[in-house]
Amino acid sequence: MAAYLLAVAILFCIQGWPSGTVQGQAMPFMEVFERSVCQTREMLVSILDEHPDEVAHLFRPSCVTVLRCGGCCTDESLMCTATGKRSVGREIMRVDPRKETSKIEVMQFTEHTECECRPRSGRVNSGKRKRNPEEGGAESQVPLGLTSF
């Protein structure tokens, strides 16, 4: 990561800012880059996605903010992954439409505390050669990620 940032800094020292760009009208490159890296960010998550067994109730609000990992890694073979987690409580109004009652209660949600770029697991296809039975057993190369059309 440090080597990449150094290369970018050297590139800008050699080339300067892109022509036609007035600083202040566009977000500077380093700020764009820093905001895009793999890190924890405040995200909205649906309560029902986090607690799918609670479909008999309505919740207000229907989603909550928690810190989750997100952002780009320097290589497409890597994915921004949570390496640390904790449980956090959020006050929610639970509505029971059958009984026409509601109450405020604390529900627990998983929040990410640390993130890291790690190799993607479960790749669709490893790109290994496969035998093509229609061509008399000849080997054919299957591009990565392509399994059907």
Swiss-Prot record:
Positions where Pyrrolidone carboxylic acid occurs in the chain: 25
SMART domains attached to this UniProt entry: PDGF (SM00141)
Subcellular location: Secreted
GO cellular component terms given for this protein: extracellular space; membrane
The protein's name: Snake venom vascular endothelial growth factor toxin 2
Subunit structure: Homodimer; disulfide-linked. Interacts with VEGF receptor-1 (FLT1) with a high affinity, whereas it binds to VEGF receptor-2 (KDR) with a low affinity. Does not bind VEGF receptor-3 (FLT4).
Tissues of expression: Expressed by the venom gland.
Disulfide partners: 38-80, 69-115, 73-117
Record's signal peptide: 1-24
Location, primary (coarse class): secreted
